Design a protein with these regions (language model features):
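C-terminal non-catalytic regions of proteins with extracellular/luminal or membrane-system context
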Residues: 1-122
Length: 122
């Protein structure tokens, strides 16, 4: 399928609508918005959950021409930097478990994540 200018315009409109439609249930300690560090460097974040890789935004009858998961969206940001080791563990889990399911958290080093990351996205 060729991507047209009109499709690109629609993608921008859809992105803006999705961003405006996100519901924040509780913003404890002003966690959001995630901002860069004081020196301007991206904020290191731990992103949890296998749905970070391919966020379901469509029903089974639709085939989107473009879909961006949570992890890829955050990685493209200049504001935050997802933890690469944690992302690799989730990608490996997804490849080894194509039937789905959530990765057990018992294999994660939460002490290292707490030390290396300033925020967590679940």
């Amino acid at each position: 399928m060729d991507i047209t200018l009109r499709m690109s315009d629609h993608a921008l409109t859809a992105r803006a609508a999705a961003a405006a439609g996100i519901v924040l249930l509780q913003n404890k300690n002003w966690t959001l918005p995630l901002l860069p560090q004081e020196d301007g460097a991206p904020l290191p974040v731990a992103v949890f959950g296998v749905k970070q890789l391919q966020t379901p935004a469509f029903d089974k009858t639709m085939t989107p021409w473009r879909s961006i998961g949570v992890l890829d969206g955050l990685a493209a940001s200049e504001t935050v930097r997802p933890d690469a080791l944690l992302a690799r563990k989730y990608r490996t889990w997804a490849v080894e478990h194509p039937e789905g399911g959530e990765m057990p958290l018992t294999n994660l080093d939460f002490g290292a994540l707490r030390h290396d990351c300033a925020a967590a996205v679940v």
